[in-house]
Amino acid sequence: MHQITEAHARELAKQAQRKDDLRAAIESDLVGVHRILFEAGCGHGHWLTDFAEANPETLCVGIDLISWRIRKGNDKKAKRGLKNLHFYKAELGEFLEVLPKSISFERTVLLFPDPWPKARHHRRRMVQPGFLSEVAGRTDRGGEFCFRSDDRPYYDWTVECLNEHAEWQVDESAPWPYESETYFQSLMDE
């Protein structure tokens, strides 16, 4: 018989509470919604806030693991009075688990994720076959996965992963959905 430690039991309880809280927030915020623009790893929300402001007809959702980034995104949302934008502190798997199946992605955006440049760390990269399958499973027919990286090896890795995936086709000539400098791009300019 296997037993879990008290610390592990506490962690499982925290995870369950986090999912319950996330589910309640999503159910409250996304009533009657069927399609969203989704940004995984939205950081401070700069790009998504600008996009939402320029595209008020599109419902935008961003997730990130770091609480203060989500707070900054929500501050930007409030300052601009945007009703079509929501930020959630969530891990991708938990978000997809609690997101109602009736909601699909018209577009998924992934901007400048950590490239994990050392070969032994590549398994930590966000773009992996499993990630692409999960996102494809929630994406509308004709939906897009938009990716940018300032790390050429990671960009090439992503193109290779997409080319090898049955659900995605790479179109490097497709126009970018919206140009707006991200927080991390602005750091590079300094």
Per-region residue spans from a language model:
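Conserved glycine-rich SAM-binding loop
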Residues: 43
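Conserved SAM/SAH-binding beta-strand->alpha-helix loop
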Residues: 66
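Conserved SAM-binding loop
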Residues: 73
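A short glycine-rich, Lys/Arg-flanked "PGG" loop and its adjoining helix->strand segment in the class I
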Residues: 127-141
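Conserved beta-strand signature within the Rossmann-like core of class I S-adenosyl-L-methionine
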Residues: 142-149
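Class I S-adenosyl-L-methionine
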Residues: 165-190
